[in-house]
UniProtKB/Swiss-Prot annotation:
Gene: URA3
High-level lineage: Eukaryota, Fungi, Dikarya, Ascomycota, Saccharomycotina
Iron among keywords: no
InterPro entries, per database record: Aldolase_TIM, OMPdecase, OMPdecase_AS, OMPdeCOase_dom, RibuloseP-bd_barrel
SUPFAM superfamilies registered for this protein in UniProt: Ribulose-phoshate binding barrel (SSF51366)
UniProt name for this protein: Orotidine 5'-phosphate decarboxylase
Amino acid sequence: MVNTETYTERASKHPSKVAQRLFQLMESKKTNLCASIDVPTTKEFLSLIDKLGPFICLVKTHIDIISDFSYEGTILPLIELSKKHNFMIFEDRKFADIGNTVKLQYTSGVYKISSWSDITNAHGVTGKGGVEGLKKGADETTNEPRGLLMLAELSSKGSLAYGEYTNKTIEIAKSDKEFVIGFIAQRDMGGHDQGFDWIIMTPGVGLDDKGDALGQQYRTVDEVISTGTDVIIVGRGLFGKGRDPEVEGKRYREAGWNAYLKKNGQLE
């Protein structure tokens, strides 16, 4: 059953400080749009985020794509933009290893993800040890609240993340009610009857395109929100060839917000 409560109502009783902040931010900015910024240079990365910042609740990064990455030159300006435009940061790292390894990948190395990313995500293939390792890493390296999304379903054609895999991933998510805040999925993942309020973030959302040559499949904003999505993740639809990021940012924000209002019965 799809959750029809408002973001404010959900924020008021959610056990996670990350989820509380995200819901409050979404309500205050009237947006459920996450911008996925996959570009190879820091200059383009920061420029796009600055343009899209007013329209988004979250920016999703693949930080290892950036060829000229440096903590001082890439991450510190990103943090400043997040303060300027009031959005949160989600590093789409898709951790998939044993607990100690993911802890080190999360906290150490070049990227030091736990120090700057509010939210990250993980596959369920290694069981709940991965969740425990990431939680321990967050606790040891930052006083800021951190949240984890589990990858329950993917938007790519031929994905193996469905059926029993999805069900097992949901069980892993139940192991930590505060740290695991939700899923990357295509629909509501349930859990309401057991007291879970998982945030559903959905990639592969498009107002114009149906797919690409590399197996991506797109669904409409209204379609995904009506089946339980809380946050729509949009990438090339915002800044692809011939698109104006500010025009598209406003367009997707309005589409996502109106779909949310319809779901909650606030808009006919």
